[in-house]
Amino acid sequence: MKTLFIAPTRNGVGLTSTALGLLRALERQGLKVAFLKPIAQTHEAAPDDSVHWARTLAHAVTPDPILLSVAEEQLSQGQEEELMENVVALAREAAAGVTGGADVLVVEGLALNERNVYAGPLNASLARNLEADVVLVSSLAGVTPATLADELEIAAQAYRRSDGSGLAGYVLNFAPLELDFGGLLADLRARSRILASGELPLLGVIAQSPTLAAPRTLDVARHLGAEVLNEGEARLRRVTSTVVTARSVPKMADLFTSGALVVTPGDREDVVMAAALSHLSGVPLAGLLFTSGSTPEAAIERLCRAALTSTLPVLRVETNSYNTASRLSRMEARVPHDDLERMERTLDFIADRLDTVPLGTRLRAPEGSERRLPPSAFRYELIQKARAANKRIVLPEGDEPRTVRAAIRCVEKGIARCVLLAQPEKVRQVAEGQGLTLPDGLEIIDPDRVRANYVAPMVELRKHKGLTAPQAEAQLEDNVVLGTMMLALDEVDGLVSGAVHTTANTVRPALQLIKTAPGVRLVSSIFFMLMPEQVVVYGDAAINPNPNAEELADIAIQSADSARAFGIPPRIAMLSYSTGESGAGADVEKVRIATRLVRERRPDLPVDGPLQYDAASVLSVGRQKAPNSPVAGRATVFIFPDLNTGNTTYKAVQRAAGVVAVGPMLQGLRKPVNDLSRGALVDDIVYTIALTAIQATQAREGA
């Protein structure tokens, strides 16, 4: 499924009508289209305009948006990641609402206004995390070509991905009827590099339409809070002009035309009679509006009764004519929820003027191998898969504060059934110290009460090494060893440790008691690096100090398979300090041999090396340094030549760029054991528990 994100370049560009008009145009192309407004435009819980029209006119099964107040609170508390995960969940729900699955999801961004100054960056983040191509919506009302070109250029740069992709096109609304279209387009292209290059194609120019902008007389009455003296056809007639009676009737008579709203004090008998005569002569006036709380004298009312009590709407307000006209000029352009006819005509009008044939072809194209997995989608899928797995995960550092908090969160969210190895009273004290309540589903096992149960099984597992019972008892004093024995005996499905222990403390018992999976020659590790635009894999950055060429090939294959298992299309870059044939020496040759071995063992995996990091990750550099590479500039799996390089790089990227690193996730063990960084945050521990739960499912399936 492809996603289109509809984004405004400024306020008042007709965002909602364009988004829904595009939806209609794509449906005419035979595409199955879903719709989503992820964040509501207002703080109130009232029905969002976009959602209302999508459900009413497009019959879309679209979920309720996140309230703007909720989104603002999450942003203010630094919880943008959680907000984006919720948006991804809504996108999945919207797509699932289309029978047989949607071909495309149309997502409407937030309109820009003075109240939500954060909307621009938030829209860019939404588009990025939904892996969406962006349609920019702008307006020709009140701007010069120079301003419009700058506006489109700036917006396009904000949404354009680092590889130049991500722009689907732009739409111009409210075009003057006398517009010199060819001249405007030439002017815009001369002023904007992106428009000149064709990266941002024009999808349509929507002309101004006074008819579509015309509210019903009923809408005017609601806006003014007017008293309805005679409803007549107030629900049917539309206001296309306003006549404020400041002159004599002979000088205004020509203005009494179809759709005119006549605004007058009730004591202007000449105007009242002229309006009545116009109505009786067959002119469908929009209505007669009395100002200053006045009405005509009784004698005039009797003379005009045939008109004033028929289909002509008659209203009254307390304000004077000047203030009333001023309020009318400030009437919102939005279409009321009960004006289906106007919105239907608006959507058809826009859909008729959008060139969606090329866009439809693009949207029908297969996903291919260039798909990216955005961070929010990765986190969402991680949690959903872990919930579905419902695995029991042991945490040997059971009274460590971050671990306790993470375990509580996992149990409360149904991510995993966590088992804390610690004295129950100590865990309760840690929880109370953080203001937390231990949930009923959180299991706490006192290790002192169960250690003896594992002495004999451990001696049996290690009898080939001559392990004695006293030695086993001593080793089982270490909770990591105890937890590993629980895993070896299938009492739990996975183990997570390392918040206070070293990597060696976590991995050594696993290698001794769990051992490697069948056919696996070594254990390695990967980090999932949650870059701004996509999730990539770094390996090995935690386990193997200096792998040889064969081991490096094994690490690459393991890492690619892990990437694919977690939804990341693997494109392997075998990293070195040189690219292609430009370097020589033992270090480069090791990478070159490892690359050849990967190709021989797994011809299904796109791989290239040696590649420098910039050639592997930056498209423009990759095209220059390795123009014929299937991976350069698009790598998703980065294999480092040694631990020194890998660990240093992952920490540099994590800290300098503020990138979340999930892991390390160990690969190659018969059952899942995962290590934590001693600087791990609570979120890091939660995601590592989720990874472990998913690995446990994969281990069962592969057994």
UniProtKB/Swiss-Prot annotation:
<comment type="pathway">
    <text>Metabolic intermediate biosynthesis; acetyl-CoA biosynthesis; acetyl-CoA from acetate: step 2/2.</text>
</comment>
<dbReference type="InterPro" id="IPR002505">
    <property type="entry name" value="PTA_PTB"/>
</dbReference>
<dbReference type="GO" id="GO:0008959">
    <property type="term" value="F:phosphate acetyltransferase activity"/>
</dbReference>
<dbReference type="GO" id="GO:0006085">
    <property type="term" value="P:acetyl-CoA biosynthetic process"/>
</dbReference>
<keyword id="KW-0963">Cytoplasm</keyword>
<dbReference type="Pfam" id="PF07085">
    <property type="entry name" value="DRTGG"/>
</dbReference>
<dbReference type="InterPro" id="IPR050500">
    <property type="entry name" value="Phos_Acetyltrans/Butyryltrans"/>
</dbReference>
<dbReference type="InterPro" id="IPR004614">
    <property type="entry name" value="P_AcTrfase"/>
</dbReference>
<dbReference type="Pfam" id="PF01515">
    <property type="entry name" value="PTA_PTB"/>
</dbReference>
<dbReference type="InterPro" id="IPR042112">
    <property type="entry name" value="P_AcTrfase_dom2"/>
</dbReference>
<dbReference type="GO" id="GO:0005737">
    <property type="term" value="C:cytoplasm"/>
</dbReference>
<comment type="similarity">
    <text>In the N-terminal section; belongs to the CobB/CobQ family.</text>
</comment>
<dbReference type="InterPro" id="IPR010766">
    <property type="entry name" value="DRTGG"/>
</dbReference>
<keyword id="KW-0012">Acyltransferase</keyword>
<protein>
    <recommendedName>
        <fullName>Phosphate acetyltransferase</fullName>
        <ecNumber>2.3.1.8</ecNumber>
    </recommendedName>
</protein>
<comment type="similarity">
    <text>In the C-terminal section; belongs to the phosphate acetyltransferase and butyryltransferase family.</text>
</comment>
<keyword id="KW-0808">Transferase</keyword>
<dbReference type="InterPro" id="IPR028979">
    <property type="entry name" value="Ser_kin/Pase_Hpr-like_N_sf"/>
</dbReference>
<dbReference type="InterPro" id="IPR016475">
    <property type="entry name" value="P-Actrans_bac"/>
</dbReference>
<dbReference type="InterPro" id="IPR027417">
    <property type="entry name" value="P-loop_NTPase"/>
</dbReference>
<dbReference type="Pfam" id="PF13500">
    <property type="entry name" value="AAA_26"/>
</dbReference>
<feature type="region of interest" description="Phosphate acetyltransferase">
    <location>
        <begin position="377"/>
        <end position="703"/>
    </location>
</feature>
<dbReference type="InterPro" id="IPR042113">
    <property type="entry name" value="P_AcTrfase_dom1"/>
</dbReference>
<comment type="function">
    <text>Involved in acetate metabolism.</text>
</comment>
